[in-house]
Each structure stands twice: as structure tokens, then as C-alpha cells.
């Protein structure tokens, strides 16, 4: 049997990514040459491996160049498309943005209170005009950043011996797949918000981001932007105020405010506020201590009301546990009775009463589990004083001038001024932690002012008031905040105390200024130039400031010293020309009865006369006919019975509450006086200046002037008429404290008769007016002074007069 041929061992399989060449093609003899041959073989293998690696490197570089070219071409195409669609897209984007965020938007009720948009990164301008547009712009900038720097494809393994061909091709396939996913995920949508509604694109972007290396810096930036976004949203929600009659806000706690969770005081340092490009506050500090009553004073138009609104809207960082209320709008006119409008302001009480009714219904149906919760509800109602709520609301309304019938009258039956009183009553009824009142006496008569003055003297929570009524500030306030030179300055005590301290401070500043000017003059006389003298003086001030800082360890005054400026004295002086003597009586009503058609008479059988030296203040609640009495004295109304008698040479100067109706709005103040009294140009301007109207306002149309400026034009007109009798109906409205003082001094110096209706207690007391009370269709003179009248008013309301020592 022939032997089978000897089988050769199987050829080893060659693993590689090139051509498979078997080493068995060459017969190798055993012996010393074998080692030499094997060494030559591995040397050849190393050479081949090196060549293959270089080829792969070249291919990889070409592939990367192609990818970069594709990205650049795509970017150019998108840029060209974006330029063509920019106008259309921008309008569509902002329109869609406002629709999506409509519930969070703030109505532009006041131009001064616009919330400034956050500054975009890198100094780029935002496309939108609000905070949301700025945030969307930041998001689009991040997407463009990712397009400029796409994720790098996975690198292929260099070890060709340990990799199979299928495994080597896999990275390339993955890179291709990743490129396709990126091209899908990063394709620009038709607008910025399409990506928010496309879940598939969001998932693809998340897959790509998982493959990218972590970017902690970018994540932190996004987190910070999100926190800022939430803060802005909370601020805008608060500013919206749901079109309510007053602003009540409670902001979300930020990380910084969390440290102040239980804070009862407000401490804000170095804040700035600007409006219409005008800086109102620069590096100002706000300090409000709990349970103190502050009066905020300063010239008109400098930002007092703006500050109150920023606090109410929490544009400034107010501790979150302090609830803030700014009473600034009248209640809605509807079928709700006035007393119910006040009671409904306490939403917590309403919820407890509703829960009480629900739990009682459950008990009646045999549900005994509600008993425990009902007991807790009763305890909460007792703690909030719910049983006495209606009595408290009616007491407040009565003090503000509402009789029992008016308290049950629907709010739509009241005028705007009376609805404003209802709004004030709601604010007093709610008792917030910080109550802010902006000119609360403007819509009140004297009796209501007396009651409010007395009521707020017993206020136990924090109070911040803006008012031009010096008597009101003297009685109510424990501290004064003075807005001056874009800063807030604090004085302990009432307004009278502040006035004395401020005058002393101004005298000291004037002395320092004069000393500085003397030093500068000496340096100039010694050969120094003006610039050198000022520099040397500043250096001396710097040394003095550093010395004081070391002595007092004062870290607040870090600003570079500036040369002192002459202290500005805000002085207003009203003057009325003295009339010639007239024989008495110069004016009077004799047997006068008057009533409007279809109504019961306001007056019956009035009989009195007025002399040239009379000083009369007519007082009484709203609606009794005080303004009507003035119209009868001026001859603008004719009595139903009886007659008005006056001296044939008598000239009457009448200041009406609706003084704007007598002005010609298209004229300037100068033109108005020139036309009415044939005055030279300079004389007309001098007359306006005497009543505190700024020189730049002399040549502005009257329709563009503020209420206070228009009032000064009317006072100037009265002076030009040279009246024998001044009849003034609420002349202090829209005047600041300095102007009211000037008016009081002018009345005291005036030689003619004065009849005034006013709710300003200080004007009444400073002019020593006799008090004539209008009540029950008659006019009678009070025996006693103003303090006696206050006591009578409060006793009639069942109140006890608070006697607080002046600080």
C-alpha cells in the first residue's frame, strides 16, 4: 500500500489591512541562516508599516481639509441666506417671542420704570428690545460657536496587527454618521424658536454633545444665564401687578437673598437708577429700619416716585420676607360695594372663610375627619382678627370721608378721587410690612387729612411717604430721607428737625467752599496757574480724606476728592402787589340761597361780609359746597335767592383747582403774560421768575409743562392782575414744600383780603386764618384755633387724638 504523501502544515493566516502575502511562498532552511532570514522579514514588515502609516496620515489630512471646506461653504451659504431673510426673520422672531412670553411681559405704563435689558456678552447688540431677546441672542451665539468648532472625528488605531479590517473601517463609518447627524442637527431652522418645538433635533443635539469633551466653563455660563433669566422673569411678573389697583409683590428668593430670609430691615448700597438717559440716582444707599416712619423729600422731578416704584416692583433687592405695597391707582369701577372692595383685599382671610364653609358642610354630612382641620381654621381666623375685619374696614372708610350710605355704594358710582380713597383704605386695611404712600393727601379734604395724620401716628409697621405737606410730615414721620445730588441723606427726627439740620449743613459747606476759594486765590497770586492751583488743592483734600479714613476706619468714602462747588440754595419767593385801600365791606353775601337744579339747596340764608384785612380758611368735608361758595363770591355763580355785593372798584384774583382750563396751552408762559397784560418780554420773564418758574420753562409751550409749573404761571397771572382780594381754591396742589412756604409768606405780607380752601394744615396755621366751617347748609366761624378743630373732627369720628412729642 503506497504511503500517503506527507501533508504540509497549514499556512498561517496573515492579518493585516494590505494584500495578504503568505511567507510560505519562500522555503526557509533550518540553521543559522534561518535567524537571519526572520530578521530581514520583520525589518521589511516595519518598513511596510511605516509606509502605510504615512499614507493614512496623508488621507486623514485630506479628509479633514475637505470637511473644513464643506463647513466653510455651508456657513457662507447660510450667511447669504440669513442676509436675505434677516428683516423678515427678525420681525417674525420677535413677534413669536412676544406671543410665547405674553404672560410675562410688562405693560409700559411709565417710561421711567422700564426694566433695562441685560448687557449682551462681547459687547454685541441684542436683536430684541427686552431681556428675553437678549437671552435668545446669547443662545444663538453659542450655536454659532459650535458650528465654527465642530466635534473632531474619532482617530483610527495605529496598531494594524491587533485590528481586523472590519474594526478599522468602523471609526470611519462612525465619523461619517456623526457628520450626517451634525448636518441634520445643526441646520439652521427658519426661525430661532423652531428648535424648541422639534424633539428629534433636540435629541440629535444631545447625542452630539455627549460625544464632545465636557466644557465646564460653558455649563457654568449657561447656568448663570438661567439664574439671571429666572430673576428677570420674577421681576417682570412683579412689575406686571395684574392690572390691580396697587402694586403688591413678593419676589422669588435668589441665592443672595436666601441669606436675608429673616431680615426685617432694608439695606441697599451703591445702586443707580436712570430714566430717559437722565441719571436720577448714582451710587446711592437705601437704609430702611423696621417699624420706622420715613418721609422722602426733595425737589420735584428728581426721582422720588421712581424710587418707590422700583422698590414696589423689586427691581432693587428687597429681602423676600418683606411684603411691599405701593398705593398708586384707584380701584376698579364695578358693582362691588366700597366696604367689600376693602375686605376683599385680604385674600388670606377670604380663603380661610371659604375653607370654613367647606369644612362645615362636610361635618353636616357626617364627615368627622374635618373637625380637626376646622379647629385650626378657627384658630387662624382668630389670629388674623377676622371677626373684627368689617368693623376695621368701616372705621377706615369713615375716617376717609365715607358715610354709612357711601360705604355700601358700588365703586362705579364714585368719581376717580373717591375711588382713590377706597384704594388708600385697602392699603391701610392690609397692613403690609412696608407701606409706601405717594402724596396721600392730594385727593383728601382737610377732615380726611386730619384723620389720616392721626391714624398713621399709631402705625406700627414700616412706612415710607412722599408728601409736600410739611405739617403731615412733622406729625407722622420719625425719620427724613433727603434726595439731594443723586444721593439719599438720612436725618433722625421729623421734617422741622431735618430743616434745621440741613440749613446748618449748608452753612458749613458754604464756609468750606469759601475757604477753598481763598486758598485757590492765594496760589494763583503766588504764580500758580489755575490748573496747578486746583491740582494742589485736590492733593491737600486727598491727604485730609486719607487722614480721616485712618482715624475713623471709614471704608465708604473711597472716591477721589473733587473741588467743592458753591452750595445751591433752592429759594422761592412769591410776591403779590399791595392793593389800594378800599372802604369796608368790600365783598359779601346777603340772604343768599343756592342749590343746583334738581338737587336740594347747598346753602340757605347766608349773610356775611369780608374786609380788606380778612384772613379766612373755609373748611369742611368734601361735597358740602366749599368750592361752590367761592364761585358765589367771585360772581361765577348766581344765587337762587339773595345777592352778592362788592365794592365797584374791587378786583378779585381767583385761583381755581382746575386752573389749567384758563391757560392757553399752545402759548408759552411768556407769550401768555405778554398777550394778557401787554407786558414787555423781560418784564413777563421777571414775573415768572419771581414765582419760581425755571428760566428754560419760560419759552416752552404751556401744554408741555408739569402741573407745578402750570400752577406757577397762574400765580404769576394773579400777581399781574393786582387784585384787592385773593380767593384760592386748593392752591398747594402740585407745589413743593419750599413753594408752599413761599406762598404762606406772600399771604402774610399781602395787604388785601385772603379767602382760601386748603387741606394743608401748615398753610392754615402759618397764615393765622380764621376757620369757617361749611355744614348743614350754613357757614359758621369756629371758636378756637386749628388744634381745637382737629379735636372736634376726631371726636365726631369716635377717634382719640394722638399727642406725640415733636422730636
Swiss-Prot record:
UniProt feature, compositional bias: Basic and acidic residues: 47-64, 147-160, 206-221, 521-542
Localisation: Cytoplasm; Nucleus, Nucleoplasm; Nucleus envelope
Domain ABC transporter: 266-510, 587-802
Keywords linked to the UniProt accession: Activator, ATP-binding, Cytoplasm, Nucleotide-binding, Nucleus, Phosphoprotein, Repeat
Location of the region described as Disordered in the Swiss-Prot/TrEMBL record: 1-221, 521-564
Modified how: Phosphorylated at phosphoserine and phosphothreonine. Phosphorylation on Ser-109 and Ser-140 by CK2; inhibits association of EIF2 with ribosomes.
Superkingdom field: Eukaryota
Protein name: ATP-binding cassette sub-family F member 1
UniProt source species: Pan troglodytes
Name of the gene this protein is made from: ABCF1
Amino acid at each position: 500500500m503506497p504511503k500517503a504523501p506527507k501533508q504540509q502544515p497549514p499556512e498561517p493566516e496573515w492579518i493585516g489591512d494590505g494584500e495578504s502575502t503568505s511567507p510560505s511562498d519562500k522555503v526557509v532552511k533550518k540553521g543559522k541562516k534561518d535567524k537571519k532570514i526572520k530578521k530581514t522579514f520583520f525589518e521589511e514588515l516595519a518598513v511596510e508599516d511605516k509606509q502605510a502609516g504615512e499614507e493614512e496620515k496623508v488621507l486623514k489630512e485630506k479628509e479633514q481639509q475637505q470637511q473644513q471646506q464643506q463647513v466653510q461653504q455651508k456657513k457662507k451659504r447660510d450667511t447669504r441666506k440669513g442676509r436675505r431673510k434677516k428683516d423678515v426673520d427678525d420681525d417674525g422672531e420677535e413677534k413669536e417671542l412676544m406671543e410665547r412670553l405674553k404672560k410675562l411681559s410688562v405693560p409700559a405704563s411709565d417710561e421711567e420704570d422700564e426694566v433695562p435689558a441685560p448687557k449682551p456678552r462681547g459687547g454685541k447688540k441684542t436683536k430684541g428690545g427686552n431681556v428675553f431677546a437678549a437671552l435668545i441672542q446669547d443662545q444663538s451665539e453659542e450655536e454659532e460657536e459650535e458650528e465654527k468648532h465642530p466635534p473632531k472625528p474619532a482617530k483610527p488605531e495605529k496598531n494594524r496587527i491587533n485590528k481586523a479590517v472590519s474594526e478599522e473601517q468602523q471609526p470611519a463609518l462612525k465619523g461619517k454618521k456623526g457628520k450626517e447627524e451634525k448636518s441634520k442637527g445643526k441646520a439652521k431652522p427658519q426661525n430661532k424658536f423652531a428648535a424648541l418645538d422639534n424633539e428629534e433635533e433636540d435629541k440629535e443635539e444631545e447625542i452630539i454633545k455627549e460625544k464632545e469633551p465636557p466644557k465646564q466653563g460653558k455649563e457654568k455660563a449657561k447656568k448663570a444665564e438661567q439664574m439671571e433669566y429666572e430673576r428677570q422673569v420674577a421681576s417682570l411678573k412683579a412689575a406686571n401687578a395684574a392690572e390691580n389697583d396697587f402694586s403688591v409683590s413678593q419676589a422669588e428668593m435668589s441665592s443672595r437673598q436666601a441669606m436675608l430670609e429673616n431680615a426685617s430691615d432694608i439695606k441697599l448700597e451703591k445702586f443707580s437708577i436712570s430714566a430717559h438717559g437722565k441719571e436720577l440716582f448714582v451710587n446711592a444707599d437705601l437704609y430702611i429700619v423696621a417699624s420706622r416712619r420715613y418721609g422722602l423729600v426733595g425737589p420735584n422731578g428728581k426721582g422720588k416716585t421712581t424710587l418707590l416704584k422700583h422698590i414696589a416692583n423689586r427691581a432693587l433687592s428687597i429681602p423676600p420676607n418683606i411684603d411691599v405695597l405701593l398705593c398708586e391707582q384707584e380701584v376698579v369701577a364695578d358693582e362691588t360695594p366700597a366696604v367689600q372692595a376693602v375686605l376683599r383685599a385680604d385674600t388670606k382671610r377670604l380663603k380661610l372663610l371659604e375653607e370654613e364653609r367647606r369644612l362645615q358642610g362636610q361635618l353636616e354630612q357626617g364627615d368627622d375627619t374635618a373637625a380637626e382641620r376646622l379647629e385650626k381654621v378657627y384658630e387662624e381666623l382668630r389670629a388674623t382678627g377676622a371677626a373684627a375685619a368689617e368693623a376695621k374696614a368701616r372705621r377706615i372708610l369713615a375716617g376717609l370721608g365715607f358715610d354709612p350710605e357711601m360705604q355700601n355704594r358700588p365703586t362705579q358710582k364714585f368719581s376717580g378721587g373717591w375711588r382713590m380713597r377706597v384704594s388708600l383704605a385697602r392699603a391701610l386695611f392690609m397692613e403690609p410690612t412696608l407701606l409706601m404712600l405717594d402724596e396721600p393727601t392730594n385727593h383728601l379734604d382737610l377732615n380726611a387729612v386730619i384723620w389720616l395724620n392721626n391714624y398713621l401716628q399709631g402705625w406700627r409697621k414700616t412706612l415710607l411717604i412722599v408728601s409736600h405737606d410739611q405739617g403731615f410730615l412733622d406729625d407722622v414721620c420719625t425719620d427724613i430721607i433727603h434726595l439731594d445730588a443723586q444721593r439719599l441723606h438720612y436725618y433722625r427726627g421729623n421734617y422741622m428737625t431735618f430743616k434745621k439740620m440741613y440749613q446748618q449743613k449748608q452753612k458749613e459747606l458754604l464756609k468750606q467752599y469759601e475757604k477753598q476759594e481763598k486758598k485757590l486765590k492765594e496760589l494763583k497770586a503766588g504764580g500758580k496757574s489755575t490748573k496747578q492751583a486746583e491740582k494742589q488743592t485736590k492733593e491737600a483734600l486727598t491727604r485730609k480724606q486719607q487722614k480721616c479714613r485712618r482715624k475713623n476706619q471709614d471704608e465708604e468714602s473711597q472716591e477721589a476728592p473733587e473741588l467743592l462747588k458753591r452750595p445751591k440754595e433752592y429759594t422761592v419767593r412769591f410776591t403779590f402787589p399791595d392793593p389800594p385801600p378800599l372802604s369796608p365791606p368790600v365783598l359779601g353775601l346777603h340772604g343768599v340761597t343756592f342749590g343746583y337744579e334738581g338737587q336740594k339747596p347747598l346753602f340757605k340764608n347766608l349773610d356775611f361780609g369780608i374786609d380788606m384785612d380778612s384772613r379766612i380758611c373755609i373748611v369742611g368735608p368734601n361735597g358740602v359746597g366749599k368750592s361752590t361758595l367761592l364761585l358765589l363770591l367771585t360772581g361765577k355763580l348766581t344765587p337762587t335767592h339773595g345777592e352778592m355785593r362788592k365794592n365797584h372798584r374791587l378786583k378779585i384774583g381767583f385761583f381755581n383747582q382746575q386752573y389749567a382750563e384758563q391757560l392757553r396751552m399752545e402759548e408759552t408762559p411768556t407769550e401768555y403774560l405778554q398777550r394778557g397784560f401787554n407786558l414787555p418780554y423781560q418784564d413777563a420773564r421777571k414775573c415768572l421768575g419771581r414765582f419760581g418758574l425755571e428760566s428754560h420753562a419760560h419759552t416752552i409751550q404751556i401744554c408741555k409743562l408739569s402741573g407745578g409749573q402750570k400752577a406757577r404761571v397762574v400765580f404769576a397771572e394773579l400777581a399781574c392782575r393786582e387784585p384787592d382780594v385773593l380767593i384760592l381754591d386748593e392752591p398747594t396742589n402740585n407745589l413743593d414744600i419750599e413753594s408752599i412756604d413761599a406762598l404762606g409768606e406772600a399771604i402774610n405780607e399781602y395787604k388785601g383780603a385772603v379767602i382760601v380752601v386748603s387741606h394743608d394744615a401748615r398753610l392754615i396755621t402759618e397764615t393765622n386764618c380764621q376757620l369757617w366751617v361749611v355744614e348743614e347748609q350754613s357757614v359758621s366761624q369756629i371758636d378756637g384755633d386749628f388744634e381745637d378743630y382737629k379735636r372736634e373732627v376726631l371726636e365726631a369720628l369716635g377717634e382719640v387724638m394722638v399727642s406725640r412729642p415733636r422730636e
